[in-house]
Each structure stands twice: as C-alpha cells, then as structure tokens.
Amino acid sequence: MATFVELSTKAKMPIVGLGTWRSLLGKVKEAVKVAIDAEYRHIDCAYFYENQHEVGEAIQEKIQEKAVMREDLFIVSKVWPTFFERPLVRKAFEKTLKDLKLSYLDVYLIHWPQGFKTGDDFFPKDDKGNMISGKGTFLDAWEAMEELVDEGLVKALGVSNFNHFQIERLLNKPGLKYKPVTNQVECHPYLTQEKLIQYCHSKGITVTAYSPLGSPDRPWAKPEDPSLLEDPKIKEIAAKHKKTTAQVLIRFHIQRNVTVIPKSMTPAHIVENIQVFDFKLSDEEMATILSFNRNWRAFDFKEFSHLEDFPFDAEY
C-alpha cells in the first residue's frame, strides 16, 4: 500500500500528515517532534493557526539532530482571506516562511475562498457583527501565489474549502499558470464528500481530509452532535481489526486515495494515528462506513454565508 499520493506535479505527498489547528503554544513544538520521530513527513500548517513559529522550531531541531532532512519533509501552509490583495499575499507568505524557518514550502493553499476585509482582524465585522468582505478575490490571490512558484519559494499551489464551481473558475482563469494540486476539505464518514472527491480526482487534483475524526475538540460542539469516535458500528469494525476507532477513520480515507491530516497533541495518539498501513478495511466495511454520510459539517461557517463566494451552498 502506497504511503503517499502523487500530485499532478509528480511530487509525492505523504498520505498521512499531522494537522496543527488548535495545537496550543507550548505543546505544538513537542507534538511536531514526536510526529517526526514517528515517521510523519507531512506537516499541515497555516498563518491563521498562529503557531507556525513553534512548528518551525521543532522542524529545525529535528533537522539539526539529523533525524530528518528538509527534502524528506512535506510542509503545507495557507494564506488567510484577509490577505487576498496581491501585495498582501507576499507579506503573509514571508511571515509564514520566516516563522517556519524554511526556504520554501511544498504546497501553499488558499485557506478559504471568500475574501475578507484587509487588516489585523482575522474576522473583520461591522458594528452589527456581520463579516465584511474585502476587495481581493481568490483569483487575485492565486496570481500572487503563482509568482512565489516562479521564484522557487513554493513547489505547488492548492486550495481549501472550495466547491467544484470555484475550482472550475480557477481552472478556467485566463492566463492560469499553475493548476491547484489539492483541495483540502472537511471529510469523514458523516461528510463523505463523494461527488467532490470524484470531481477533484477527475481533474488530477488530490483531496486532503481535515477533521477526519469529526473534530471532537471543536469549541462549539453541542452535546447532541454525533460523535464518530463513539459510533458503535465503527467501534465494531475497529475491534475486529484490533485497531482504534481513530485508526479505522484514518484508514477509511487512505483507501479512497485521500490524504488525511489528523491533529493530536497527545504523543500516544500521534504515534497511533500513523500506524494504519498494516491492515485493510474490506469492501463491505468501506461501504458500511460510506453509508454513514449525512452531510453533517463540524465546520459550517454560517457566519460567512451572506458574503459572495460562500462555498457550502452548492451540493459539492
């Protein structure tokens, strides 16, 4: 079983990576070091997570220890929508590169398709509490990102949270130089994203699954929300394979050729989450897990839905 997916650029993206959203300062550095020791080579970062300097420290320490070389690692980061105006893309990118203490990124993503008002606030709101859109669009940001590829600062570009209409707009953009290599979206058995995955794969775009375990630690979780890790059917499948429910959920993506980036700050879980290459789910088990789909999102971003380019109104 391949432990990577091949991008349209022929680069190899490790199929399991470490997610770092909500990885707390003071803890994320250790988490990244544990992950590298456990043979993770793919680390998923973002300007918005405000912890890239610690991720960078961990990477540098591991490189200095000769535990890993930079070229063995696959580092992804993202530009936030308050930076969509062309000069700001570079400003945000330069901070990311400096924080991560790297000379290049393997993939740079657009974090979210809607442009927000520029400024220091990640979620700019008017006096009524409504989000304010910005002048820059994802197409403007893409042009600035293409320059980073031309300069050798980024190997490839991608998107996140895009629906297929938005990807079409990007692919059909006049003068497009570089196609997106991946679309990173929320994906798990309650949101299987079958049509979107099929569409992306048909265009040579890989899919990366964030919140593959259903984001159990999200701050806005309600007691009545479904819990994937506690799902009796998934527990049953896990017991049969002598694996944890998390390992089954991660394996589910791997068998769909979907890259998966579970986040954990617990060393034992970090190690466990990559021990997913020594078992295989049967076709029947895959079908059972796929049948759980209910188009339920842990992240619905409803507060952005009044702005242009909201991605989740489309079927896929």
Swiss-Prot record:
Its EC number is 1.1.1.-, 1.1.1.300, 1.1.1.54, 1.1.1.216. CDD domains: AKR_AKR1B1-19. InterPro entries: AKR, Aldo/ket_reductase_CS, NADP_OxRdtase_dom, NADP_OxRdtase_dom_sf. It catalyses: 17beta-estradiol + NADP(+) = estrone + NADPH + H(+); testosterone + NADP(+) = androst-4-ene-3,17-dione + NADPH + H(+); 17beta-hydroxy-5alpha-androstan-3-one + NADP(+) = 5alpha-androstan-3,17-dione + NADPH + H(+); 3beta-hydroxyandrost-5-en-17-one + NADPH + H(+) = androst-5-en-3beta,17beta-diol + NADP(+). Widely expressed. Expressed at highest levels in steroid-sensitive tissues, such as placenta, testis and adipose tissue. One of its GO terms (molecular function) is allyl-alcohol dehydrogenase activity. Keywords: Acetylation, Cytoplasm, Lipid metabolism, Mitochondrion, NADP, Oxidoreductase. Pfam families: Aldo_ket_red. The active site is at Y49. The record marks K78 as: Lowers pKa of active site Tyr. The keyword Oxidoreductase applies. GO terms for biological process: estrogen biosynthetic process. Inhibited by the inhibitor JF0064. The keyword Ion transport does not apply. Substrate binds at H111. NADP(+) binds at residues 20-22, 44, 160-161, 184, 210-217, 261-273. It comes from the Eukaryota. GO terms for cellular component: cytosol; mitochondrial matrix; mitochondrion. The modification N6-acetyllysine is found at K125, K263. Belongs to the aldo/keto reductase family. Has no counterpart in murine species. Monomer. This is Aldo-keto reductase family 1 member B15. The gene is AKR1B15.
